């Protein structure tokens, strides 16, 4: 655990506005490989969440509203963390998540953990990425600052 948190602290310096978003490949709910760079040309929100996270679940209706409003220019990628595959898939189905959903396995080494690479230290964490693949902003928690920034960015 200590090594994981040290890596998160090191990653924080790289996950800032204007920096390239680290590329990754993870499995989708239908067991296909998804690579972040495949969405170049669109705005992207990485939503780091888990089925166990109350605030993550409470934020789903608002995320759906923004997704419906901006889906012609925006893709959301739900990155499930610290879950079992079964709980993740059940949550995707139960909450009818309409966007891309990928699973970040909890048993991978910290150096291969996407949540570590994106310096996620709490949930939910949302990262807005521009069509050029550069990070626009990172937002921890479920609050209006993320939605205001997203609206201002995409409008």
Which functions belong to the PLM regions below?
Residues 97, 106-154:
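Thiol/disulfide oxidoreductase modules built on the thioredoxin-like
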Residues 44-47, 75-78, 100-103:
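Structural recognition of the beta-strand scaffold that forms the well-ordered cores
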Residues 40-41, 47-65:
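Conserved redox-active cysteine motifs that mediate thiol-disulfide chemistry
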Residues 43-44, 124:
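Alpha/beta-hydrolase fold active-site loops
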Residues 58-96, 107-116:
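Structural microenvironment flanking redox-active thiols in thiol-disulfide oxidoreductases
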Residues 40-42, 72, 97, 120:
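Active-site acidic short loop of glycosyltransferases
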